[in-house]
Each structure stands twice: as structure tokens, then as C-alpha cells.
Curated annotation (Swiss-Prot):
Co-factor note (free text): Binds 1 Mg(2+) ion per subunit.
The protein, known as: Cyclic GMP-AMP synthase
Gene Ontology terms describing biological process: defense response to virus; nucleotide metabolic process
Alphabetical list of InterPro entries matching this protein: AGS_C, DncV-like_NTFase
Length: 443
């Protein structure tokens, strides 16, 4: 197992960390269509409302080509559409709140003719829509003159030039391969944030801050995993004392969050630092285990054989003995087996239970990670998920997509991996129907 190739490899376009972070072409094309439709609607609506030239400029992750797949099928990705009004709003006494409210009314009108869109809760610096197709559109609105650009916020007009910071990010590296590496590293960090902040309620490290950090701290090595490790260590060192990322153009802080969110971010950055330090002197197998835990279902399935002691993980002393209880789509019990690989029909449900859970420390935890592979799962924005519980607790999952998938069970205690098992699940399209062969003679 080459851990670097699990991050990114020219020869592997199907199952790497980089590939698994990228949005499905089907999902992205739907989002682009919605984006274009919304722009054309707002162009006419706002032109009449403000009696001025109205233009649009895409910004954020979509513009910088660092969009990543949402963390699960219940989450969404963002496309940011900057709305520009070409008149001096302040000079004409136009209040920023009135501008935002007019934009919100226009978005509400759009929702009335598009049942896939719902109005988002208003934010200080933008309004937006949430679509049913995994898409969120944020629409910050500005006024622009020959000498200034101001963003409409609830607190007034604010200096802001997203195009300038985007140009800074785009042009930070001149070499094409350096730019490509930077974008990949940004995606890796965003995947890490998605996983570690999921369901916590804490504000995430903003995408713009991640872009600036990666640009300023990117370390180039022959191996892709080393690029991530040493870039992460440099970033962690930068943020260790104070969680501040300065805008390189105006010195403002790109990370602004409540104290509890800041403490949580420091905790996760400390964990990231320790993982990366552990990886420096580790072999590929041990690195793979660390990265599987770090990125969870975004990371490709790794292979460990803890039974033979060849893992390079001396702490792995017990192999989870997992039984799989299988039910068909009608809830009828089909079988209960202990196996490393099984074939099921789409619609079946599987319950995984660690039979020897008593062999593990009573304070350990079991992390169950589902990894879905294939176009059906990819287009449904469901490449997997991770659930943590007690080793004595069973875990149930469905079988919604045809293809080869895995269920990974990782037993953790005090941050150390003390057990590991992978079960491969082959999902067939449907129950096979045997056709009767009718033999007859022709006269």
C-alpha cells in the first residue's frame, strides 16, 4: 500500500482522497444550471428595483476551483454569487439594510416560481437560497464605483473586494503544477474540517482562511502525503498561539468566531498536529490507519491484516470478530454470518456486531466507517459516513447502491488504534429471477 497514491495519483482516477472529495459531475451540472437561472432572474429583477446596471461575479470555492463534496447526503455545497450595483449607494443615501432587504424580496420572488429553492435565514453579510439538490447559493451584494467597492451588511457599508483576494490566491504561485498542488491541499484540509466539525455546532474555519493558509504554508515534497503532513504542521504552528489569519490585502482577521468555537478549533488543530508528527516516522500501513481515522469516509479504504501482525501497528492486539445479520427488503431474516466479504441484494439491511467486544478496553470506542464506491453513490452525494459508539453496540446500514462497498471497524482507545477490521460488501442490482427454460420441438 502506497499511502501517497491514496491521496492522489495520475494513474488512479477512481478512488483516491482527491477524487473522493470532488463533486459528482451530475450534481455540479445541476448546480451550475440553477446558478445561471438565478443570475438571469436577479439581473432583470434588481435592474428594475435599483434602476442601475447590475452585474454578477462568482467568488469563493467555486471560483477558486476548490469545491468539495459535502460531508454527507444531508449536507450541501456552496456557490457564491457576488451581486454588483453600479452606482454610489452611500453618496445617494441608500442604506445597506434596504439594499439587502430588496435583494431578499427578489430571492423570495424567485422561490415563488421555483419549488426547489427555499430562502435561507438572513446573515449579516449576505442573503441566500437553499436548493433541494445539495446546493446552497449565497448572494452578497455590493455597490461599485470607479474608486471603491462596498459590501452591504446589517451594520452598514463595509470595505470588501472579493475579486482582489481571489486574484491574490490565483496568482500566488506562477507554476501550473504548484497551483494544482495548492488546490488539492485546500480540498484535503476542507475535507478534514468537514469531518471533524460535523454535528458539533461550532463555526468552521472559513474556506477563504484555508486558501490563504495553504498558499502561505505549502510544502512541496515528492510524496503527496508528505506535502499534506508538512503543510499541516506549518499551519498548526502558525495558529498554535492565536487563531488569527490575516487578509494579505487589508490585514483583517479572516477567522472570527466565538471563544468556545475558537477553543474547539485549537483542540482539533492540536490533534491534527499530533497525527502528522506520528506519521513522519511511520510506514505506509501505519500512515494509512492514521489518515483513515483523520479523513474517515473521504479517505479510500485501506487494508490492514492485524491477525498476522504485519500491520506495523504494535498496539493492535485484538481483531474485532464481527457477525453480520442480514435482512431482505421486507425485513425477513436471511442469514447471520462471520465473514470478510459478502454479496447482498440492493435493499437488504445489514447489522454489524462485534462478538468479542469484551476483549477490548471498557473505555474504548468503535468507529464504524461506511465507504461507498461507484457512480450511483457519487451522484447521490453519499460516499459514506462514520458513526462512533461502544464496542458492545451494533451498527445497522442499508444497501442503496450497486457496486463494491466497505464497512470499516476501528477500535480506538486514548487516540490509539487497538483493533481494525474491514468487511467488503458487494451489492447486486436486484434479486436474480430464474427464468424457466421452455423446450419444445418444431414440427
Amino acid at each position: 500500500m502506497n499511502c501517497s497514491d491514496l491521496f492522489y495519483a495520475d494513474t488512479n482516477t477512481e478512488n483516491t482522497l482527491h477524487q473522493r472529495t470532488q463533486l459528482s459531475e451530475v450534481i455540479l451540472s445541476k448546480g451550475i444550471a440553477k446558478k445561471n437561472e438565478l443570475i438571469e432572474f436577479l439581473r432583470q429583477e434588481l435592474k428594475e428595483a435599483f434602476d442601475c446596471d447590475v452585474r454578477f461575479w462568482l467568488q469563493g470555492s467555486y471560483k477558486s476551483h476548490t469545491l468539495i463534496k459535502p460531508v454527507d447526503k444531508f449536507s450541501s455545497y456552496d456557490i457564491d454569487i457576488g451581486v454588483y450595483l453600479f452606482f454610489d449607494a452611500e453618496n445617494e443615501g441608500v442604506d445597506s439594510k434596504d439594499v439587502k432587504e430588496t435583494l431578499r424580496d427578489a430571492l423570495l420572488s424567485y422561490c415563488s416560481i421555483n419549488n426547489e429553492a427555499k430562502l435561507q435565514e438572513s446573515k449579516n453579510a449576505c442573503e441566500g437560497l437553499k436548493f433541494s439538490t445539495f446546493l446552497t447559493v449565497d448572494t452578497p451584494i455590493y455597490y461599485k464605483t470607479d474608486t471603491k467597492i462596498k459590501l452591504a451588511t446589517d451594520k452598514g457599508w463595509s470595505d470588501s473586494d472579493p475579486k482582489a483576494i481571489q486574484d491574490w490566491i490565483t496568482n500566488y504561485y506562477k507554476d501550473k503544477s504548484d497551483r494544482a498542488l495548492m488546490k488539492r491541499l485546500v480540498r484535503y484540509f476542507k475535507a478534514w474540517v468537514n469531518v471533524k466539525w460535523q454535528n458539533t455546532g461550532f463555526k468552521k474555519i472559513p474556506s477563504l482562511a484555508i486558501n490563504v493558509l495553504v498558499a502561505q504554508h505549502m510544502k512541496q515534497h515528492v510524496r503527496e502525503d508528505d506535502c499534506f503532513i508538512y503543510t499541516a504542521l506549518s499551519i498548526c504552528e502558525e495558529l498554535e498561539s492565536t487563531l488569527i489569519v490575516r487578509n494579505p490585502l487589508n490585514n483583517s482577521n479572516l477567522i472570527s468566531m466565538p471563544q468556545d468555537a475558537e477553543c474547539f478549533a485549537h483542540q482539533k488543530l492540536d490533534e491534527l498536529k499530533q497525527v502528522c508528527l506520528s506519521c513522519i516516522k511511520s510506514d505506509d500501513i501505519k500512515r494509512g490507519a492514521h489518515f483513515s481515522n483523520l479523513f474517515q469516509h473521504y479517505f479510500p479504504q485501506i487494508s490492514l491484516d492485524s491477525a498476522t501482525g504485519s500491520t506495523g501497528l504494535p498496539t493492535v492486539v485484538n481483531v474485532p470478530e464481527i457477525s453480520v445479520c442480514r435482512y431482505d427488503k421486507n425485513g425477513n431474516h436471511v442469514e447471520t454470518i462471520i465473514t470478510d466479504r459478502l454479496t447482498v441484494n440492493k435493499g437488504d439491511s445489514l447489522t454489524f456486531t462485534i462478538r468479542n467486544h469484551y476483549d477490548f478496553n471498557i473505555y474504548s470506542s468503535a468507529q464504524w466507517t461506511v465507504r461507498n464506491i461507484g457512480s450511483q453513490a457519487n451522484d447521490a452525494n453519499d460516499i459514506g459516513h462514520s458513526v462512533t459508539g461502544k464496542p458492545s453496540e451494533s451498527h445497522k446500514r442499508g444497501t442503496s447502491y450497486t457496486g463494491s462497498h466497505t464497512m470499516e471497524c476501528m477500535i480506538l482507545h486514548n487516540g490509539a488504534i487497538i483493533g481494525f477490521k474491514t468487511i467488503h460488501v458487494i451489492v447486486k442490482p436486484a434479486r436474480t429471477v430464474r427464468r424457466k427454460t421452455l423446450k419444445f420441438w418444431r414440427a
